Amino acid sequence: MAGGRSGSRELPETPTWAVAVVCAVLVLVSAAMEHGLHNLSHWFRRRQKKAMGDALDKIKAELMLLGFISLLLTVAQAPISKICIPKSAANILLPCKAGQDAIEEEAASGRRSLAGAGGGDYCSKFDGKVALMSAKSMHQLHIFIFVLAVFHVTYCIITMGLGRLKMKKWKKWESQTNSLEYQFAIDPSRFRFTHQTSFVKRHLGSFSSTPGLRWIVAFFRQFFGSVTKVDYLTMRQGFINAHLSQNSKFDFHKYIKRSLEDDFKVVVGISLPLWFVGILVLFLDIHGLGTLIWISFVPLIIVLLVGTKLEMVIMEMAQEIQDRATVIQGAPMVEPSNKYFWFNRPDWVLFFIHLTLFHNAFQMAHFVWTMATPGLKKCFHENIWLSIVEVIVGISLQVLCSYITFPLYALVTQMGSNMKKTIFEEQTMKALMNWRKKAMEKKKVRDADAFLAQMSVDFATPASSRSASPVHLLQDHRARSDDPPSPITVASPPAPEEDMYPVPAAAASRQLLDDPPDRRWMASSSADIADSDFSFSAQR
């Protein structure tokens, strides 16, 4: 008995120095992580990267959520292990095949429970009952949720890094817009045939013009030259013409980079619908269905479909340029519109990318978890080569989504009808919001002054006796012969005006009349500013 207890000592049997060392290590590691995140947040603020700071705050929120889940699993471990269900219900929808070894292990576990005088499984005391989830299985689930969150955040950071790496080439194209060669290319005095422009020739070739082959061309184009220099410059000019002045010196590359950072704070989090998707995958992971095998190709299909659709948007804009005019003046002008996107919603593209990143992280986390946990490798990886293929597909999908699809999304979705709020710098946005706030306050003052002015007008105009008494309503009344005569009631004189309007209201009205006229003029001049809308349509 003593030998059996030597490997499972409880806290009273543990040396104090061992407890202190373990606690010190845990506290120091946690404090170092918290201090590092705090310094990183300050670094983002100093460099005026508010979107990245918000993304870091969302990562902190995910870590807090993990802490709550960990706490709930620890607290609820004992109560859940005492929830008993019939063995018939416990033997259906299993993720692994219940073989002879499992049956023998279950029998041996039952014998050990009986030998331990009820010190084992709580539900083993009842005939035909088993626990809903054992303490060991809850511990394994706890580890899986932690691994899933770590992989999701890691994949999002990789996506952002590879996307920024791809966009570095676009910065060189942006700098060329200040050259004389570019100014000559977009000179409005130049006339060219539409089909001779580089943008139209690239996207409306012999195969691209055929409706049936256009989707095939768009599918393969996302792998080879998804965004070229002529594509970037044409969409840049179209965005400036639609939302800014034509000769504006606008840094389109910097705007896209800010938009990408703003979208990153969306994809880095795990929303409630994504948690439900993960729970659904766990529920469908039944032996014989091969759910984890065929569902691993779903994010790949989504990414390829999204990339093809984005390339199709560029082709449709080129087709519209050709259909609009045979001869163009200056550079070809694309017209941003939501009609190019699914259901006129460009923000749906970001949702599909977010779903893909989460699902891919789920697959990789499940693979690492089952390979590292003793006893799960044989269950979930009966065909190890098929599992290796899943890993290769997942890695390829991550590179494709990060280096091709995500930057392509950042560029093409700017061709929607609305511009994002990142069109302004952070300080400019704060100034506009403060301006709007002050204008709303002035509008409230103006409305209050107008109300008091109306009260003063009513105060100065005496009410007529006709409207003060209801006797005039009897002029059209014809008395019947059988009606008894009724005495005529003379209306009482109207009440004094001091009774009709209390003293505070009258005093306030007189105070309004004594106010200088420039104060009321300033309040009325802010009406248009207060009614202005400084909100921006966020395409996400």
UniProtKB/Swiss-Prot annotation:
Described function: May be involved in modulation of pathogen defense and leaf cell death. Activity seems to be regulated by Ca(2+)-dependent calmodulin binding and seems not to require heterotrimeric G proteins.
A Pfam family annotated for this UniProt entry: Mlo
Segments in the Cytoplasmic topological domain: 38-60, 164-265, 309-347, 405-540
Compartments it resides in: Membrane
Organism superkingdom: Eukaryota
Species of origin: Oryza sativa subsp. indica (Rice)
A molecular function GO annotation: calmodulin binding
Topological domains, Extracellular: 1-16, 82-142, 287, 369-383
Protein name: MLO protein homolog 1
Gene responsible for this protein: MLO1
UniProt key word Transmembrane helix: yes
Residue ranges crossing the lipid bilayer per the database entry: 17-37, 61-81, 143-163, 266-286, 288-308, 348-368, 384-404
UniProt comment concerning the protein's domains: The C-terminus contains a calmodulin-binding domain, which binds calmodulin in a calcium-dependent fashion.
